């Protein structure tokens, strides 16, 4: 979606899809994309408990990452569910494709991603998210345990599958799975240890 929003030839692409495939594409705005992701994940939010009253929804796509900052509210008569209110959303030009284009492979002698490359990527992503983070004090709230983080789409489900050591995607085991930061770190470390043959 973001690729079509940013592309110089986005309108020509939509016209070509219509002409060749008889499909009318609609490129939606970033805030509508965030709202649709929110609806798709609505059953995943735990009811707010104490100070844990916020959620960060992130969707790492092919052309961008959508981030949505949410306030969680109790649902009358449903103590284990949360109602969500969008506080803010942003579409960041950061994803697997854009990072690969910007940083390349950065492999060491063994064909693994170098620690230097990984550090550069992390710094770049932090820079892209800094204004959104500062505007809402998200890092502080995450450190205080006040935030649920919900990820959606292929990158997140793939990372979950890596952590679970699945030979192939298994929706029943992946969808709705909760991971701790240490578990995400374990999956990251596993991926960083792979070479191009793996």
Residue ranges of model-derived segments:
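Active-site-adjacent helix-turn-beta-strand microarchitecture at beta-sheet edges
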Residues: 63-64
């Amino acid at each position: 979606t973001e690729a079509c929003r940013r592309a110089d030839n986005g309108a020509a692409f939509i016209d070509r899809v219509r002409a060749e495939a008889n499909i009318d594409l609609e490129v939606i705005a970033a805030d509508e994309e965030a709202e649709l992701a929110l609806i798709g994940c609505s059953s995943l939010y735990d009811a707010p408990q104490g100070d844990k009253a916020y959620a960060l929804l992130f969707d790492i796509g092919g052309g961008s990452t959508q981030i949505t900052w949410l306030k969680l509210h109790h649902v009358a008569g449903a103590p284990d569910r949360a109602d969500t209110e969008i506080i803010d959303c942003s579409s960041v030009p950061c994803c697997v494709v854009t990072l690969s284009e910007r940083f390349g492979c950065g492999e060491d002698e063994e064909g693994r991603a170098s620690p230097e490359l990984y550090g550069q990527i992390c710094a770049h992503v932090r820079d892209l998210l800094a204004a959104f983070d500062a505007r809402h004090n998200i890092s502080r709230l995450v450190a205080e345990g006040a935030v649920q983080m919900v990820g959606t789409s292929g990158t997140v489900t793939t990372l979950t599958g890596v952590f679970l050591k699945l030979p192939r995607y298994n929706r029943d085991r992946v969808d709705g799975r909760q991971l701790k930061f240490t578990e995400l770190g374990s999956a990251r470390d596993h991926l960083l240890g792979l070479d191009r043959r793996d």
